[in-house]
Amino acid sequence: MTVGNMESAALFDAGKKGRGLEATKELSAGEVVFTEPSFAAVVFDSFFSQVCHSCFRRQADLHRCAQCKFAHYCDRTCQTACWDEHKQECGAIRKIGKAPGEHVRLAARVLWRIHKSTGLASDSQLISVDQLQDHVSDLPEDDLKQLKADVNTFLGYWSHGRKKHSADDISHIFGIIKCNGFTLSDQRGLQAVGVGLFPNLCLVNHDCWPNCTVILNHGNQSALSSALHSQRRIELRALEKIPEGVELSVSYVDFLNLSADRQKKLKEHFHFECTCDHCSHHTKDDLMMATVEGSKADKVKEVTAFSKDYLEKIETSRVEGDYHHVVKLCSECLEKQENVLADTHLLKLRVLSVASEVLSYLQSFSEAADYAHRMVQGYTKLYHPNNALLGMAIMRAGVTHWHAGQIEAGHRMICTAYGILMVTHGPNHAITRDLESMRTQTEMELKMFKENELGYHTMRAAALKSQPTS
């Protein structure tokens, strides 16, 4: 599909929701509805030296811009590809002596781009950036104070001699970024490393049980011929069969929250009341709060309070890097929850998630696999069957089972995850390619295991001993 092609989607009046996009033809699960390069994007301050400012891949030994000494790139190819975006920024950073925060940098990039292209980067862009909603009038007092501080910082950063902007104009851009900024992940999808503005994507309305998902395609800058290079872009992909004329939707928040909590988050950040079917009917809230049959109300209340308190302690210990204490706290919390909270209860799932992650890090794979299995079973009952977060969780659980020597279970999970991520990410994404390699490897090992179990264990032990898992 050509980047920016909007033949599969069209703008329409979505009633109370305002504008929206609808399918102009029947779409299949995994089909790319449209792709869109960023109007502007920046790397987060905390990753400025660890992530390429062009393709947003995270890696070691990046090359630093010799002029501003702030921007970092994979190589000269990425630096050249990003020069149009970085040129004005580079001069501004040199002028004030340091780079401002990510929101100020993104606002400046947006305005530089507007000056260059009057807010429309291409013919396929359905709306100009300055027409996007800013919701500045809806911001609470604390957010307005922060906005004012950002505007003042911006005025000091904006180059002298350029077109002057009023505080209201700049506030409008900051408001647009706050409401419409899309978080960008690294090439493994494991870490949020930046934020960008994608005007056409901003037209896709929210649904807690959406029919589409968005992923970042980091592009290809490694081909020998520059004619084969492709730019960084988002892809809107169908999660299921979508008939012609049906509204396209994505989820702005993680579904793994009670409907009231999702509605609160959406109201606070995006300033609208969610009335989707899952919120209106409180769908799956019963599972997210499920208790073991026969549990008394006062016991449930006690365990719920205990779990919330322990989750705070667990997070504190994790931030401090005291992972053995994290495991101890998780074990105590799960023991308290046993026979009271069901495995689909959100509080239990959060403890299971941390426990499996930390135990895997500590290479206690058998115990980690047990927790991961329970976590995945709970997730499967709650998430959309093609949810990307579900796919990633099953993938990690599969790898954990493989490390634990549970080859058959690990292979089965990896195959399940592969099926989901083929829909959400497509066959060419780095995550899917890695998963395909794992799937092939575990399939081969499973075959070897069934043919010669003793020989397999001997070979595997030697391999793991020579290549310890980090």
Model-derived features with residue positions:
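Short alpha-helical interaction motifs and adjacent low-complexity tails used for partner binding
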Residues: 1-470
